[in-house]
Structures are given as structure tokens and as C-alpha cells.
């Protein structure tokens, strides 16, 4: 866990541009390290997860860009697009935080078909209507990496179906701020 003294934050605010550039540099280094681990794992699926608001989508997009700059073909999926329609949810799916809200079979099927090099209809979820709002085509490749990001990607209900082919990545802001009282 990173620890920052409150006084250092105050000093950093005197040069906001430098502070932002340093934060970006730290983030880039973490993306670079994650990409290296993913490439060395020889596993074609990245299951990226973290709590709500942790930066999963941003991290997944940055990881995708980084890998593509290395010449790797990447397919990026958001688990949010694989939610079941509200009227088809089982009783266990009490809220959006429940893994039972996810159409796991469709998610796993799309991942598998992308890795087989097939063109796949990827759903997009309409949260206002509470159902799939349509589909967009995505072309897979035999040697591609599929990054699937979402709050439940490391949940055993999902991860156990892809475990042998997946690298798990957990994203969370973990910075402790020290005040004069600490």
C-alpha cells in the first residue's frame, strides 16, 4: 500500500502539473508491469476486476492500448454488457452487485469464440430499459488476448469457467493518507 503524507499533497498542489504527471507515470509503470506479467503467463484471457469506482474500465483500456502498441491484438469486453434482463434474473440476483445478474454462459461463449478467431455479436446493455439494447460485432483472432473487465470477473462463478486460460488482475486504489494526527 502506498502511503502519502498530507503535507506532501499540499506541497504537490503548488505544482499541479508535476503532480498529475507523476501520478500518470506511476499508473503507466503499473500498466507496463501488468502487461509484462500477462505476456509471460501465456494465458489468452485477462480477467480484470476491482471494486466499484476503482478504475477497472480505464485500466482495461490503458492495458489494451499498451499491449496493442507491442503488436498484440486485443479484444476488450465489459462484463456490464452481459447483465441479464431484469425480468430474467434468478431470485439470488438481488442487486447489480450480485454475480447472478451476469449471463455467464454468454460471456464465456463470447470469450471462447473470440479466441477461436470468430466474429462475435457482443451485447451492449441498456441500463434504462433493463435489457440488452443491441449488439456490436467484434472480430477475434487466434493469437489475440481477451481482456474482460468487471466487478465479478474473479468471482468463482465466472472465473472457474476460464481459470486455466486466464490471468487475474485486481485493480484498487490503495493509498493511505497520513495527517498530522497519525
Regions found by a protein language model. Name each.
Residues 46-48:
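Hydrophobic anchor at the beta1->P-loop junction of P-loop NTPases
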Residues 56:
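Conserved lysine of the Walker
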Residues 75-77, 84-130, 145:
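Conserved nucleotide-sensing/catalytic segment adjacent to the nucleotide-binding pocket
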Residues 1-33:
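Charged, amphipathic alpha-helical linker segments immediately N-terminal to NTP-binding catalytic cores
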Residues 53:
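Walker A (P-loop) phosphate-binding loop of P-loop NTPases
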Residues 142-143, 148-182:
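ATP-dependent NMP and nucleoside kinases share a basic, alpha-helical "lid"
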Amino acid at each position: 500500500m502506498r502511503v502519502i503524507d498530507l503535507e506532501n499533497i499540499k506541497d504537490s498542489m503548488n505544482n499541479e502539473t508535476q503532480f498529475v504527471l507523476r501520478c500518470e507515470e506511476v499508473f503507466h509503470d503499473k500498466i507496463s508491469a501488468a502487461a509484462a506479467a500477462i505476456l509471460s503467463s501465456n494465458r489468452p484471457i485477462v480477467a480484470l476486476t476491482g471494486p466499484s469506482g476503482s478504475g477497472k474500465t480505464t485500466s482495461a483500456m490503458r492495458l489494451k492500448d499498451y499491449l496493442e502498441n507491442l503488436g498484440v491484438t486485443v479484444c476488450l469486453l465489459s462484463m456490464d454488457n452481459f447483465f441479464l434482463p431484469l425480468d430474467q434474473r434468478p431470485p439470488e440476483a438481488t442487486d447489480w452487485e450480485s454475480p447472478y445478474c451476469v449471463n455467464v454462459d454468454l460471456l464465456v461463449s463470447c470469450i471462447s469464440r473470440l479466441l477461436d478467431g470468430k466474429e462475435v455479436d457482443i451485447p451492449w446493455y441498456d441500463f434504462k430499459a433493463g435489457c440488452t439494447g443491441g449488439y456490436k460485432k467484434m472480430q477475434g483472432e487466434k493469437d489475440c488476448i481477451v481482456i474482460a473487465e468487471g466487478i465479478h470477473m474473479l468471482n468463482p462463478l465466472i472465473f472457474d469457467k476460464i481459470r486455466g486460460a486466464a490471468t487475474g488482475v485486481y485493480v484498487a486504489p490503495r493509498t493511505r493518507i497520513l495527517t498530522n494526527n497519525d
